[in-house]
Each structure stands twice: as structure tokens, then as C-alpha cells.
Regions:
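C-terminal catalytic histidine-bearing segment of alpha/beta-hydrolase fold enzymes
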Residues: 2-5, 21-30, 320, 331-385
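N-terminal cap/lid segment of alpha/beta-hydrolase-fold proteins
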Residues: 20-49, 106-154
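Acidic catalytic loop of the alpha/beta-hydrolase fold
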Residues: 267, 324-328
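Short beta-strand/loop motif that positions the catalytic acidic residue
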Residues: 313, 319-321, 325
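Primarily recognizes the serine-hydrolase "nucleophile elbow" in alpha/beta-hydrolase
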Residues: 25, 212-275
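Short amphipathic alpha-helix adjacent to the substrate-entry channel of hydrolases
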Residues: 174-192
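Short beta-strand element of the alpha/beta-hydrolase
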Residues: 156-166
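Hydrolase active-site cap/lid region
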Residues: 97-113, 244-296
Length: 385
């Protein structure tokens, strides 16, 4: 019995420590993975805590301390759930304030409510869609490809071009494909691109690759079923930076909107406010991408900052960012939000107080559900024909 009580108490302590990751930014790269689990799969931890609380209630040893830690852990694990309901409650009003009355109630939308606890469990399933890989650009020593998911709807349809994350130096077009499948099922063509990576290829190589991918999709529109008048760019982290920079500098009228998941927007500010080195050596990442520090190649940093290219004609923008992101500071999205507001650009910043980097890893988690709800309406709005 003593051994069983000790094991139970140690498990409760471990859960208590894990629960703190739902409240505070992750302290290291390795705990970041745990933070994703805690914040985007909270129902698992809530169930465990409830079971341990019941077990502890009937135990004779360590009852007081164990019960207190169980209660605190339950509250912490519940934070993403409560936060999602809170954000979702006001989301319709904020979205329509940004993009117009009625834009949340367009016909044919799949997810009718921003968030539901039961959807975290009932939404789990296999929704894969087949893709075809096409080569879209060739440079010396590198052949670039894109994965094309055909819209699950007949006729010419808008195309969403996706840029993966990976600090500009890693990753590929198959990163987190759930959003590709989801959007294709909603009737959009999806092209997830591979682009040239640092440190071998430096800025603005990925922007050039995005332009080449769009050109390829336009020239093969008939066979792919792409409506070339309607492109939306979507990217995560480094990919978020790439799609913002592309949408703001290519000046292509066919790009109707841009969706940025936690992408850096002001590279000088980002360099001068580096991440916790236990999480990521962000200055080294930027030096590899730009070819030096912000003082060594200042023009590269200026030219690589999407915030510097905002005008009144800037593409409508949707930003989604976790406020507990330890990889890309949430302040960077706040800064772009302010600049877009000053220039009266239609935009929305969806801030998620509990969320960390890659928060949409599970589209059924609190962050994933809110992201789906918002993206679906944003894309439908900017591609209305």
C-alpha cells in the first residue's frame, strides 16, 4: 500500500508540473512538445486528473496535498478549454467587424461553431486526400516540387498555396497536411510547395519560389482546375513570413488573401529580441537566412520584413498566433496588426492566450477548431465570385 501511495503521489506531482505548461511559456525546446500535448489535447489530461482525484479521495495517505495538486492541475488543464470558449464567444463579432456583416454566415460552411469540447474527440478520424506531386521550378542543383490536392468540387476553383515552416532551413511540403485535406474537402485546390532552404539559399529565394509556384499554377490552370483569379497564401512560422512577404511585395492582383500562422513580421525587432536559447537560437536562424546580423546586412533585414510593405492596398490578412509562443514572439503579430489597422487594411489577429508554437497541430484541439472556423470564413469571403 505504501508503494502504491508513493507511485500515485509521484504521478500527481508529475501531472501538476505538466499542467503548468498550459499557463506559462515552454522553458525549452523539448518541453515544447509536452506543451503542445497539454494545450491541444486537454481532454486526455482532464480525464487522468479526474481519475486520480477520485482515487486520492478514497486513499488514506497524502490525501490533502494530493487533492490540492489535483484541483490546481484540473484548473490549469481546463484553461485551454475555457479560453477557447471565451475566444469563440466573441469571434463572430470580431470577424464581422473586420470583414463585414454576414461574413461568418456564408452558405456551405462546414464548421458552424468556433469551438466545442466534444469535437476534440468526435472530430478524430482519417480524412486523407490523395495528392499529385508536380515539378514547378528548376535551379542549378535543385528541382522544386509542389503537392497538389484537387478541390473536391467540380469546375474551376480557387487555389490555396501553402508554405511550410522550419526556420527557413528545414521542413517540406508534407508538414502538417491535415489543413490541406480539410481545405480540399471544402472545395479549394491546395498546392503545398517546397522551396529553397537556408543556409545554402538566402532571402529572398523563398519569395521567388512562391512567385514561380503561382506562375506554374496559372500556366497549368486548365488541367488542374484552378481559377487563376483567386489565390490565397497560407504559411506557418517561417512559412508565415514567406506568405506575408509574398502577398505584400509581389503585387499580384490574383492574390486575394493571406493567412499567417505565427510568422515573424519585423525581422530587425525579432533579431534584437531573441528567443530563449533553450528553445531556439533565433539569431543564428536569421543570420543563416539573411547572410549576417541585422547590422551586417541591414538592407536584407529591412527588405525581409513584411511590416515595412504595408500600404492601404495591402492584401486582406488573417493572423493566427498563440500568445504563449516561445519561438515567435506574439508581439510581432501585434505590431503587424497595428500597422494594418493604421492603413485600414481588412485584417484580423486571432490571438490564442493559451497556445504555443504550432498550435494547430491538431485541427480538433482548441486552437485548431478556432483556426478552422476562422480560415474557412476568411477564405470563403476573399474568394467570393
Amino acid at each position: 500500500m505504501a508503494l502504491k501511495s508513493m507511485v500515485r503521489f509521484l504521478v500527481i506531482i508529475l501531472l501538476f508540473l505538466l499542467s503548468l505548461l498550459a499557463i506559462f511559456p515552454t522553458p525549452s525546446h523539448y518541453t515544447w512538445y509536452l506543451t503542445l500535448m497539454v494545450t491541444e489535447f486537454p481532454w486526455i489530461f482532464l480525464a487522468i486528473v479526474i481519475g486520480l482525484t477520485i482515487w486520492t479521495f478514497y486513499a488514506k495517505k497524502c490525501k490533502g496535498a494530493s487533492c490540492v495538486m489535483c484541483v490546481i492541475s484540473f484548473i490549469c488543464f481546463l484553461y485551454p478549454v475555457a479560453g477557447a470558449y471565451g475566444v469563440g464567444h466573441d469571434l463572430k463579432r470580431k470577424f464581422e467587424a473586420a470583414f463585414g456583416t454576414g461574413t461568418t454566415d456564408l452558405q456551405g460552411l462546414h464548421q458552424q461553431t468556433p469551438y466545442a469540447f466534444t469535437r476534440m474527440i468526435s472530430g478524430i478520424g482519417d480524412n486523407k486526400i490523395a495528392y499529385t506531386t508536380y515539378p514547378y521550378a528548376t535551379y542549378t542543383g535543385v528541382n522544386l516540387t509542389l503537392d497538389f490536392y484537387r478541390a473536391q468540387k467540380p469546375g474551376l476553383q480557387p487555389c490555396i498555396v501553402i508554405a511550410h515552416g522550419g526556420s527557413w532551413k528545414s521542413g517540406n511540403s508534407q508538414e502538417l497536411p491535415d489543413i490541406d485535406w480539410y481545405l480540399a474537402r471544402q472545395g479549394y485546390n491546395v498546392a503545398s510547395i517546397n522551396y529553397r532552404l537556408a543556409p545554402e539559399y538566402k532571402s529572398p529565394a523563398p519569395i521567388e519560389d512562391m512567385q514561380a509556384a503561382i506562375s506554374y499554377l496559372k500556366s497549368h490552370a486548365a488541367e488542374l482546375g484552378v481559377d487563376t483569379n483567386y489565390f490565397v497564401l497560407l504559411g506557418r512560422s517561417a512559412g508565415g513570413h514567406i506568405v506575408l512577404e509574398s502577398a505584400y511585395t509581389l503585387h499580384d492582383p490574383c492574390i486575394k488573401g493571406v493567412v499567417d500562422f505565427y510568422g515573424p513580421t519585423d525581422m530587425v525587432w525579432a533579431y534584437r529580441h531573441p528567443d530563449n536559447p533553450l528553445v531556439m537560437h533565433s539569431q543564428k536562424v536569421m543570420e543563416d537566412f539573411f547572410g549576417g546580423s541585422d547590422t551586417q546586412v541591414p538592407q536584407k533585414y529591412a527588405d525581409g520584413s513584411p511590416i515595412n510593405f504595408v500600404t492601404r492596398q495591402t492584401t486582406p490578412t488573417l493572423m493566427i498566433h498563440g500568445e504563449n509562443d516561445a519561438h515567435v514572439n506574439f508581439e510581432l503579430s501585434r505590431m503587424l496588426d497595428k500597422k494594418l489597422e493604421e492603413n485600414k487594411v481588412p485584417h484580423l489577429l486571432l490571438g490564442l492566450p493559451w497556445a504555443t508554437h504550432a498550435c494547430e497541430y491538431s485541427l480538433n484541439g482548441p486552437s485548431g477548431q478556432l483556426a478552422k472556423y476562422t480560415i474557412e470564413r476568411f477564405v470563403r469571403h476573399v474568394t467570393r465570385r
